[in-house]
Swiss-Prot record:
Keywords: Lysosome, Membrane, Repeat, Transmembrane, Transmembrane helix. PROSITE patterns: EXPERA. It comes from the Eukaryota. InterPro entries: EXPERA, TM6SF1-like. Broad expression. It holds the Pfam family EBP. This is Transmembrane 6 superfamily member 1. Residues 60-185, 216-350 form the EXPERA domain. The gene is Tm6sf1. The chain crosses the membrane at residues 3-23, 34-54, 62-82, 110-130, 139-159, 166-186, 218-238, 268-288, 331-351. One of its GO terms (cellular component) is lysosomal membrane. The keyword Zinc does not apply. It is found in: Lysosome membrane. May function as sterol isomerase.
Length: 370
């Protein structure tokens, strides 16, 4: 493959601009099932066009076509976000009203912007890596965590929230959106990991240091304990814990947790059942040397938390959220400090495990014992 293939995918993704404009005007004249059929046909056509771009030298990695299609949908989501803000008009108006009305929520708005910016850049980078036959495992694992977190919250939230009675045929487009990232995740994980050629002496010296002799790791451990408590606390609020502290926190700090759209509740439950076990495992990995799986799981979790906190913070403050559920003006500084710190912690841990992995690598002696 050549660099021109990656450029072709970029141009193909930009074709979403005229396509959405035409699609919006045609959709106004047809029923919901026809709209779904046409949307599915467009996505299939994008995949076929991506295949045409590389017909002379097809990529070895079939995920090239997945990223090409998802890059197209990312531009669509960016268009949706811009239209919701009134910056553009006439591109997805009918679809937002009749196809997926839950995208009009504050949470839907935020994930559109995240997908249209962060995910879009990731797709372009991964397509370029495939074109140049380079490894993209690190950014791929980060993307897997990000997109799966959005699926885990957004799809169930559409069903159990206030829009559950307005599920339209377009909801079935979520099926490939859910299945493809899972398949992609397994393929990315099974790619060869980066080879670290550290001398055995360097690994032994790094792994001989106790936690107290690793100040940055010690700070991470303390922060992980605090983050675990924070996750459990907000998870209890999502489960309607009647404790006075939970009631006061909801009333004066994060009333958005009670939003009937249900996305914040599901997000807090995802933190409780996804992040808390991860924090426990990460604590073990920071104390016991040779946990070679640490870099991978920290990347996946960091991607998930980045997406989740961006969407949660944005939706909590967004004008589309009812005033009674928005963060009070006097609580904004504390709310932002707390939630940004919670979102930054996994990024720091992922950075530490990825770029200074000596403590987590197995020595040759350990490999021989296995």
């Amino acid at each position: 493959m050549s660099a021109s293939a990656a450029t072709g995918v970029f141009v193909l993704s930009l074709s979403a601009i005229p396509v959405t404009y035409i699609f919006n005007h045609l959709a106004a004249q047809h029923d919901s099932w026809t709209i779904v059929g046409v949307a599915a046909l467009i996505l299939l056509l994008v995949a076929l066009l991506a295949r045409v771009l590389v017909r002379r030298k097809p990529p070895r990695d079939p995920l090239f076509y997945v990223y090409a299609v998802f890059g197209f949908t990312s531009v669509v989501n960016l268009i949706i976000g811009l239209e919701q803000d009134g910056i553009i008009d006439g591109f997805m108006t009918h679809y937002l009203r009749e196809g997926e009305p839950y995208l009009n929520t504050a949470y839907g708005h935020m994930i559109c912007y995240w997908d249209g910016s962060v995910h879009y850049l990731m797709y372009l980078v991964m397509v370029a890596a495939i074109a140049w036959e380079e490894s993209y495992r690190t950014i791929g694992l980060y993307w897997v965590g990000s997109i799966i977190m959005s699926i885990v919250v957004f799809v169930p939230g559409n069903i159990v929230g206030k829009y559950g009675t307005r599920i339209c045929p377009a909801f079935f487009l979520s099926i490939p959106y859910t299945c493809l990232p899972v398949w992609a995740g397994f393929r990315i994980y099974n790619q060869p990991s980066e080879n670290y050629n550290y001398p055995s002496k360097v690994l032994q010296e790094a792994q001989a240091k106790a936690l107290l002799r690793r100040p940055f790791d010690l700070v991470l451990v303390l922060c992980l304990f605090l983050a675990t408590g924070f996750c459990l606390f907000r998870g209890l609020i999502a489960l309607d814990c009647p404790a006075e502290l939970c009631r006061l926190y909801t009333q004066f700090q994060e009333p958005y947790l009670k939003d009937p759209a249900a996305y914040p509740k599901i997000q807090m439950l995802a933190y409780m059942f996804y992040s808390v076990p991860y924090f426990v495992i990460a604590l073990y990995g920071l104390v016991v040397p040779g946990c070679s799986w640490m870099p991978d799981i920290t990347l996946v979790h960091a991607g998930g938390l980045a997406q989740a906190q961006f969407s949660h913070i944005g939706a909590s403050l967004h004008a589309r959220t009812a005033y009674v559920y928005r963060v009070p003006e006097e609580a904004k500084i504390f709310f932002l400090a707390l939630n940004i710190a919670y979102g930054v912690l996994p990024q720091l841990l992922a950075y530490r495990c990825t770029y200074n992995p000596e403590f987590f690598l197995r020595t040759k002696a350990d490999e021989k014992l296995e």
